[in-house]
Amino acid sequence: MLLSKKFLVRSLMVLFVLLGILAYGQIDYTISSTIINKHSIWAEFFNMFGEVPAMFGLLLGTTILYGLRNKKVMWKNILYSIIGLFFMLQSSFMICFMPIKYIFEFSKDGVPQGFKILSCVLAAIVFVSSVIIVNRISQEKLREFKKIAIVFILLVVLEILIVNILKVVWGRPRMRSIESIEQFKYWYQISGPAASNEFMSFPSGHTANGFVILAYSMFLPYFKKIKPNLFISFALTWGGLVALSRVVLGAHFLSDVLVGGYITILVFYTLNHIFIKDKNNEGFSGKKRRVV
């Protein structure tokens, strides 16, 4: 499924309006400080698992490209296998370790050794399963997913890169790090370079990673039983809850999550338009694609 230009323009207009409102007075600070609840169970759930769609998308993309490696030329097969397996293993580890890392985010001793071992074991299971599954899928079927794999990889890499560059440049203190309105910085105030992670509030990386779930809409032409609008509603709800959870936990202001989410939407739309969409609104496999 493709996000339409109309959707992009409308969402951009909403973003600008909201950022304009949040730039006035103490609205951004007031809203964020009002809903903060550092002990919220549901917010902690999305704090732990909100970024999984991005890491799993990275695993999905690298696994598909690994399955499409050139097996006829030995040196290419060996080289691409090493590169592919390395990134598959890394993605598998991130999927399993990130939720555990956030459990002990503020622990003085960090992640206990037992949990580190557990994450490695789980990562090994995910990694081996990925290798087995991709080797059972035909080359013809994998070729259908090649451009989707490229979009996933570029989307995750680009949104993480853009977000982290902005974080360092902006140097905005997190909600949990300030004690009064006097220490508050508006979203448009550039105070970088960031001295530490506590000054990397703008924009929200969690939210950007959470909205990567929208990219799974590219698989909808292959799963006819899933209603497109229902999936998009679910994806936007997931991204929205990830965003809200970051504000509730005091990790971000409302303006941080708005920009973080839109970065992913914009990058996804651009990549989707370049790699997937054609004049007839068909996918790269020739299957008709629906637009929302």
How does the language model describe each region?
Residues 42-57, 107-125, 194-222, 254, ...:
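Membrane-interface loop-to-helix entry segments
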Residues 57, 87-91, 125, 153-165, ...:
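Hydrophobic, lipid-facing residues on alpha-helical transmembrane segments of integral membrane proteins
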Residues 51-66, 119-133, 212-215, 261-277:
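Hydrophobic cores of alpha-helical transmembrane segments in multi-pass inner/ER membrane proteins
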Residues 2-123, 170, 174-175, 180, ...:
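N-terminal transmembrane-helix/juxtamembrane module of multi-pass inner/ER membrane proteins
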Residues 75-93, 146-158, 235-238:
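Transmembrane alpha-helical segments of multi-pass membrane proteins
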Residues 27-34, 94-106, 137-226, 232, ...:
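Membrane-interface loops
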Residues 1-4, 75-79, 136-147, 282-292:
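Membrane-interfacial, low-structure loops and terminal tails that flank and connect transmembrane helices
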Residues 2-15, 187-292:
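Membrane-embedded catalytic cores of phosphoryl/pyrophosphoryl-handling enzymes
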